[in-house]
Curated annotation (Swiss-Prot):
Record carries keyword RNA-binding: yes
Family: Belongs to the RNase PH family.
The gene coding this protein: rph
Protein name: Ribonuclease PH
Molecular functions per Gene Ontology: 3'-5'-RNA exonuclease activity; tRNA binding; tRNA nucleotidyltransferase activity
Amino acid sequence: MSRREDGRLDDELRPVVITRGFTSHPAGSVLVEFGQTRVMCTASVTEGVPRWRKGSGQGWLTAEYAMLPAATHDRSDRESVKGRIGGRTQEISRLIGRSLRACIDLAALGENTIAIDCDVLQADGGTRTAAITGAYVALSDAVTWLAAAGRLSDPRPLSCAIAAVSVGVVDGRVRVDLPYSEDSRAEVDMNVVATDTGTLVEIQGTGEGATFPRSTLDKMLDAALGATEQLFVLQREALDAPYPGVLPEGPAPKKAFGS
């Protein structure tokens, strides 16, 4: 089988690097790199929940996605300067939030909010899937931080790991983790979000240049799930290291009555 322009096999990921503790202030901070795509993912913890959730005793997780002006070849204006958030940005922000809420027990957070921020430093295809993959690691560190602070009712609120990958049909071949040069000419383009328990969170797919049969969809899903298995290994390896910052001290234990 002939190799792709960058030398990879069709089912081969770009080099993936997950760096924890990329910045110091958030409870979780990760730089995730899929080849030349680089995304900073942070998870910040704040007391309180949105107004519509107050009094529920449950927490919340929300996410925002943005691209730096010079993340692509041609500089783009900041959406904050334009005065409105674009439809693509809103769609990806909601996708990241949905994906991560699928793995966490919000009741265990109490009335606290975890805010996920994914900022694309450099884009070369697959920014949303890289963001989800990195944000899960940042979320895991935020959960560790909350546990150390004594703010969790369940010390293990994460039920599974979450990772995502792009997959497409390019030149008639199913390929995973598309860089921009492939993504821009793909006949079929898809993003797959999966759990490490073998289930799916979300599938976004479309025929860009042509329709495609069910058999192609099955091949794409098989390729994507094979790629996410590799990503889960990388996430676990990254999280095997100690927490990369200083953990808070939890509340002092209450004295027993009469002591």
